[in-house]
């Protein structure tokens, strides 16, 4: 059975996010799509995501565009089902009266969306998340000030670090670009590293939210060792063999099938 367009688009966007270039021939070989299907999907992507450039028989991810909103839109599309699963699990760990840090990123945004009926205090470092929380009447939300990363809407740099020092909370929900048993939590850029590290330092309990694609991967910038993390929340796409390996290493995993 051939894949539906939304599934094809997600596969192509995921490849483009990682490699910044996808040719018609590559899409045909990697995903088994017909040439006519690839061409139609390329045109659809260009129409929906203005930062994508269609060349002769290819698509390119335009990092130089002034329209940075699409960068966030692409990232939010990747592993969207997994992110919603993770957010739903994380929501079960939150009770009325809690005060916690909520990190930046699309998975954390999904958790923010789950807080509409919560009576909590949330400190965040993300413009999108702050905007979401500001709509909920019983959520007392604080946003950390500092430099905003274009296209990602996270807040960082030295001013943000100073403001985080004003808080000390019971729990933090953080995200990451990659994690492995050997190198711990790592990030693709330095921008969020300082904030993540400081949030971990100012929290008594740290919950890492990471979809299955983040496991056994390494990015250039170190954030923390896994010993700093109390619980890792992931999705149903995490292979059992990987889950068992992390559990044997002492990691506490919270997965959809953990709920009986």
Swiss-Prot record:
DNA-binding span(s): 22-41
Pfam families, alphabetized: DeoRC, HTH_DeoR
Alphabetized GO MF terms: cis-regulatory region sequence-specific DNA binding; ligand-modulated transcription factor activity
Domain named HTH deoR-type: residues: 5-61
Top-rank taxon, per record: Bacteria
GO biological process: regulation of DNA-templated transcription
Keyword entries, A-Z: DNA-binding, Transcription, Transcription regulation
Function noted in UniProt: Putative transcriptional regulator for the sgcREAQCX region.
Protein name: Putative sgc region transcriptional regulator
Organism: Escherichia coli (strain K12)
Name of encoding gene: sgcR
């Amino acid at each position: 059975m051939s894949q539906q367009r939304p599934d094809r688009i997600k596969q192509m966007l995921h490849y483009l996010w990682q490699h910044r270039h996808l040719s018609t021939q590559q899409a045909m070989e990697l995903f088994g799509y017909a040439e006519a299907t690839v061409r139609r999907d390329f045109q659809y992507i260009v129409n929906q995501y203005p930062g994508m450039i269609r060349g002769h028989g290819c698509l390119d991810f335009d990092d130089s565009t002034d329209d940075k909103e699409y960068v966030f839109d692409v990232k939010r599309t990747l592993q969207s089902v997994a992110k919603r699963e993770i957010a739903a699990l994380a929501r079960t760990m939150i009770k009325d009266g809690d005060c916690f840090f909520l990190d930046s990123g699309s998975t954390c945004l999904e958790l923010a969306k789950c807080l509409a009926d919560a009576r909590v205090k949330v400190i965040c470092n993300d413009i999108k998340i702050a905007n979401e929380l500001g709509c909920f009447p019983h959520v007392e939300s604080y946003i950390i000030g500092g430099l905003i990363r274009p296209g990602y809407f996270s807040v960082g740099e030295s001013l943000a670090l100073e403001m985080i020092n004003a808080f000390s909370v019971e729990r933090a929900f953080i995200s990451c670009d990659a994690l492995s048993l050997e190198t711990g939590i790592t990030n693709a850029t330095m921008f969020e590293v300082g904030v993540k590290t400081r949030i971990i330092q100012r929290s008594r309990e740290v919950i890492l939210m990471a979809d299955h694609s983040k496991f056994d991967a390494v990015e250039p910038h170190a954030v923390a060792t896994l010993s700093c993390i109390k619980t890792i929340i992931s999705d149903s796409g995490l292979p059992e063999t990987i889950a068992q390996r992390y559990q044997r290493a002492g990691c506490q995993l919270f997965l959809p099938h953990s709920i009986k």
